[in-house]
């Protein structure tokens, strides 16, 4: 969540967007964030889905996921947020996230017992500290933050609050191949520079790097985010950079880069990848958004490169079956995800009529493949590739409360924008509600 209040939304105005950080850079650096000492708030989302496919497309029938009608209902996220100002320059920020009811486990690696894995059920792995940091505001151009921070790689991580995407669920491509929400322990430098048509925001970070134990076939590096143990390995840090251009009213263009020199050196056991060689990870992303009172349009792409993927795949098949990792291989050398969505504000065409609700019909296309390309010796799994169309409605009952409904069709292994292939399509209708806001401020 960010420091600035949501803009007012009327029947003829655009809905607000919640920006990426705990503090919106321009306003926080000038201490213009509308609270004097502390504030408490949060965001959450609830979703029900009605599906015509089974739970696993990889096993069983050769045509992929079996035809099976099933329904689900969940609370994907409930997040509580707190900001506290020690003074105008030192700020404590925190968010606690409850996922899917807040149950789970944490793991310990017992080095005194031959490196066996043990679980601690009481830790609750699905109740997580999403953010916990101290910020030192210096000047608008340069500020420092230390602690547990959001890693803004990709559009969804940078703008992950539920009113910042049209669908009932977060965009599937990015959340399949990248951790979401991605948060790590580390140090961040951020600020704004330029003016007028040459205005930019930037973020630069050094954070705990990815753990290659968690890399697998279906989600690439998404399960390599650290945090399942009581301490994170910092042997090979992750280096993050993000730049956002905001010089044109209504337009934001962003790009981010992630680099970890050797994710294998962050593994649970130091000798797991001793014969593999270094396992470097590089992730490149670009995204854009344009909005005015009539339309909101977004687009994004992700490209990832993993070194020594064949040797890594072989090593990960030998991980302990007591470990929390999937051990499903092969792990791809390259992955790709790209998407675009657009929504139209119907109320903007009824100027002056405040009785017209703020409704955005929208459409979205996504392509993603965690098995885009392997090394010469690897055979990629075609059923990992998905081409998706989603269409639906967003009704902004309040400026920061939205009711969503959408229909999604997912084509598997086709490498086409339209059309079906040899595998069954996966279709679902979903309805949900999401909110964000500050409940108390002083």
What are these model-predicted stretches?
Residues 1-59, 442:
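N-terminal periplasmic/intermembrane-space "pro-region" immediately following the signal or transit peptide
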Residues 8, 14, 53-55, 67, ...:
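Outer-membrane beta-barrel pore domains
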Residues 33-52, 67-212, 235-240, 244-252, ...:
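Outer membrane beta-barrel
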Residues 58-64, 111-112, 163-171, 221-224, ...:
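Short glycine/proline- and charge-enriched loop/turn segments
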Residues 121, 174-176, 226-230, 328:
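Active-site rim elements
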Residues 180, 230-237, 276-280:
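Active-site glycine- and acidic-residue-rich loops that bind
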Residues 209-221:
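C-terminal ends of transmembrane alpha-helices
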Residues 220-266:
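Loop-centered beta-sheet repeat module
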